């Protein structure tokens, strides 16, 4: 078995959700799924994001389209924060020359 892959069936059972929900997230591009002999597996690296999405959907009652928007905005925010850090470091470099 692959230690970096979690069976979608096991994830769904432990979170009491339908496997079709995982399929919907995959079809919308929110998560990646690896298929081994037709069985879906979720990469362990995506487990945190998948659990966050499950909470948004079931606990906060946000639909898949809303989750897509939130995930997109979070990625943009993270990208902007990284860019801001690069610019701050560059500014520090110029300020230290004086």
List where the protein language model places each region.
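Major-groove DNA-recognition helix of helix-turn-helix-type DNA-binding domains
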Residues: 19-35
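Polyanion-binding surface elements
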Residues: 1-21
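Arg/Lys-rich, alpha-helical DNA-contact motif
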Residues: 2, 28, 32, 39, ...
């Amino acid at each position: 078995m692959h230690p970096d892959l979690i069976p979608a069936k096991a994830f769904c059972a432990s979170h009491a959700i339908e496997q079709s929900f995982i399929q919907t997230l995959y079809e919308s591009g929110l998560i990646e799924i690896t298929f081994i002999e037709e069985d879906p597996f979720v990469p362990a690296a995506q487990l945190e994001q998948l659990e966050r999405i499950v909470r948004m959907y079931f606990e906060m009652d946000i639909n898949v389209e809303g989750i897509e928007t939130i995930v997109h905005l979070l990625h943009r925010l993270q990208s902007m924060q990284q860019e801001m850090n690069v610019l701050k470091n560059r500014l520090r470099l110029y300020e230290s020359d004086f």
